[in-house]
UniProtKB/Swiss-Prot annotation:
It comes from Drosophila melanogaster (Fruit fly). SMART domains: PINT. Residues 298-460 form the PCI domain. This is COP9 signalosome complex subunit 1b. Belongs to the CSN1 family. Pfam families: CSN1_C, PCI, RPN7. It comes from the Eukaryota. The gene is CSN1b. GO terms for cellular component: COP9 signalosome; cytoplasm.
Length: 525
């Protein structure tokens, strides 16, 4: 049914008593990833990319190109350079097409205030207002303009010869690995068959075929001859499942790896590297399922000395993910005991000094400095493909926890001083506190006229009487149960269940033997 347009006088009308607060579970969470646009990142893209290896490096560079227009060209070029070390021809073609489209889209629209070399680098159109030519500078400009694009063209132009060569090599290697696996199966050597499946899966992974790689890694399970082989198979499946973002599969194989006899019975020191890898994978899966407190505990259990798997996650990621989730969900005691006083996680925080300062300032109740530092690292977090969809939620939880901790010792608080402490306006702060009161996180009332927040005074006398009555009822119930048990023991009364045949008999026998009588009285119940 078509919607009729509103009259011009009613389009800007606002109904009275309208509360300007968005519903908490609207489509904002589902579309958050699509709305991310990062304008001012402060990361060194080369250093960032070198923390990872394999497909995860390509995925992260592609994500940077998606959300950050400033780094898009550089990220795509780095991804193209790296993908040429693999057999992933399809991804090379996709990346090159995106780079070509990006360059074609940027060339006709140079910045309005660009001048000098930037203006000369853009391809002039027939309608462009060109200044008078500088005859003396033309030979130099032409030489520079011819030399620089030549190098760039050689490095990032579409290489059809490389595509054909890689496709042929990939096909030959696949045929060889497949024939080797058939020979191993004909010889019925389990260890060789297991290795053959792993080699075939590694090749599929290099070609970017994640589905077939997952199938081959999973098939190796039937040919594992030791617990170590089972754990290795589980780790491979977990790795590919993370690439596919199948988090339920990740958690399932983490449980299988932890229940392997050799891993469960072995010492924690002997399996420290595998344990750390499983904890990081579990933390990543719980983070994506928005179980932030569980994710924080998994990341905090990681061992810094054994955290070396760039094909999945970096040590800096462990610090950032674990630190932010802990800030958003831990109380002061947990934050002190599990994060600040943790000798293991302290090594992770050394890699992220800004995050370390944020945690310490939050614990010291310096909320203005803490929130300012959080805003400074926000853009860098938004270029991380795993934490970016959760940044808004985590920041909101951290801010709400800071408000709760700030107000908890007081019976009343001046909202003007609170607004100064949180770098906010009084109106915005009042809306935040109102939402916390509605959610039941703060027991308080707002004096909107004087801008004062009053804590609700609980009647200690009534609450004490209520607790006393509840405890009295519990004691009475326990006492009656004890008296009944003592009477049954004194009368030699006990209940014997009858074996059920075919599931039709649900009865039991109550045997009562009084005194020294040898005859038992049976009653059917």
């Amino acid at each position: 049914m078509p919607v009729l347009p509103m009259p011009p006088l009613m389009q800007n009308a606002v109904e009275p008593m309208q509360v300007d607060i968005a519903p908490p579970n609207e489509d904002n969470e589902n579309n958050e990833e699509q709305q991310i646009v990062v304008e001012n990142p402060s990361i060194d893209l080369e250093v960032y990319a070198n923390q990872y290896a394999g497909i995860v490096r390509l995925h992260r560079l592609i994500y940077v190109a998606d959300v950050c227009p400033v780094l898009a060209v550089e990220a795509l070029k780095m991804a193209i350079t790296y993908v040429q070390t693999t057999y992933n021809v399809n991804l090379y073609q996709v990346l090159h097409k995106r780079l070509s489209d990006l360059n074609a889209g940027n060339a006709p629209a140079p910045p309005a205030n660009a001048g000098g070399d930037q203006a000369g680098a853009a391809a002039p159109g027939p309608l462009a207002a060109a200044p008078l030519p500088d005859i003396a500078a033309q030979p130099v400009a032409q030489a520079q303009g011819q030399a620089q694009p030549a190098v760039e063209k050689d490095a990032f132009a579409y290489d059809a010869a490389w595509v054909d060569t890689k496709m042929k090599k990939a096909a030959l290697k696949l045929e060889k690995l497949d024939s080797d696996l058939k020979n191993y199966k004909s010889n019925s050597i389990k260890e060789s068959i297991r290795r053959g499946h792993d080699d075939l899966a590694d090749h599929y992974l290099s070609c970017g075929d994640l589905t077939n790689a997952l199938k081959c890694y999973s098939r190796a399970r039937d040919y594992c001859t030791s617990g170590k082989h089972v754990v290795n198979m589980c780790l491979n499946v977990i790795k590919v499942s993370i690439y596919l973002q199948n988090w339920a599969h990740v958690m399932s194989y983490i449980s299988k790896a932890e229940s392997t006899p050799d891993f469960a019975e072995g010492s924690k020191e002997a399996n420290a590297q595998v344990h750390t890898r499983l904890e990081c994978a579990a933390g990543l899966a719980e983070l994506q399922q928005k179980k932030y407190k569980v994710a924080a505990k998994h990341f905090l259990n990681a061992n810094f000395d054994h955290c070396d798997f760039p094909e999945m996650i970096s040590t800096s990621n462990v610090a950032v993910y674990g630190g932010l989730c802990a800030l958003a969900t831990f109380d002061r005691q947990e934050l002190k005991r599990l994060v600040i006083a943790s000798t293991s996680f302290k090594l992770f925080l050394e890699l992220e000094p800004q995050l370390r300062d944020i945690i310490f300032k939050f614990y010291e109740s310096k909320y203005a400095s803490c929130l300012t530092l959080l805003d400074e690292i926000r853009d860098n977090l938004l270029v991380d493909m795993y934490i970016a969809p959760h940044v808004t939620t985590l920041y909101t939880k951290i801010r709400n926890r800071a408000l709760i901790q700030y107000f908890s010792p007081y019976m009343s608080a001046d909202m003007h001083k609170m607004a100064m402490a949180f770098n906010s306006s009084v109106g915005d702060l009042e809306n935040e506190v109102m939402q916390l009161i509605l959610d039941g996180q703060i027991q308080a009332r707002i004096d909107s006229h004087n801008k004062i927040l009053f804590a609700k005074e609980a009647d200690q006398r009534n609450s004490t009487f209520e607790r006393a009555l509840i405890m009295g009822k519990q004691y009475q119930r326990h006492t009656r149960m004890l008296v009944l048990r003592a009477a049954m023991l004194k009368s030699h009364i006990h209940v014997k269940s009858i074996s059920r045949e075919g599931g039709s008999n649900h009865g039991a026998e109550l045997c009562v033997s009084a005194g020294s009588s040898t005859t038992a009285q049976l009653a059917r119940i």
